[in-house]
Regions:
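Domain-level recognition of soluble alpha/beta enzyme cores
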Residues: 126-155
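Short C-terminal domain-edge/linker segments immediately following a structured domain
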Residues: 43-48, 114-118, 140-144
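Short glycine/proline-enriched coil/turn segments at helix->beta-strand junctions
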Residues: 53-54, 78-81, 104-108, 126-128, ...
Length: 155
């Protein structure tokens, strides 16, 4: 895939934050994970450790639920890198994510974010429309645009 005159290579791990508390009280950005969401994210981390090597870089939304999702996944990964926690990803569109990916060719990159961006990036890279539930993880080969694996907490 070519983005801004860069050929995307490497692997993309797209993570939609796990199940979050309802937004009835307080600000959306501050919503944390439910106990079920924390358990699903930890399970996703154990699964991910069997599928991809240690990530080279991680871009994580600064929303509490996204940070907590990464914190539950990371302990299962070998030599997990510190994430770049960025408020910009909270409102980022697919183009922003693809631009970020273009910055490190050949890397295994993890993006922990929100819908609709996660589904839109997955569709842009693979050419297939697919629903991504809270806590789901997609692993994509960027050079071919092929979906290599998909984990759904409700499988």
């Amino acid at each position: 895939m070519v983005v801004m005159n860069h050929v995307l290579t490497g692997s993309l791990v797209l993570v939609r934050h796990a199940k979050a508390e309802s937004g009835e009280e307080g600000e959306d950005h501050a919503r944390g994970l439910t106990s079920r969401g924390r358990a699903a994210a930890a399970e996703a981390g154990r699964w991910l450790a069997t599928v991809v090597p240690a990530p080279d870089r991680v871009w994580c939304s600064s929303a509490a639920r996204a940070v907590q999702t990464w914190e539950a996944i990371a302990p299962s990964l070998p030599a997990a890198v510190a994430p770049v926690v960025d408020r910009a990803l909270y409102l980022a569109g697919p183009h922003d994510v693809l631009q970020w990916l273009a910055g490190s060719p050949g890397a295994t990159s993890v993006v922990v974010g929100h819908n609709p961006t996660v589904e839109q990036v997955l569709g842009s890279v693979t050419g297939e429309l697919r629903g991504v539930r809270p806590g789901a993880v997609a692993v994509v080969d960027l050079a071919s645009g092929r979906l290599l694996d998909f984990w759904d907490p409700q499988r």
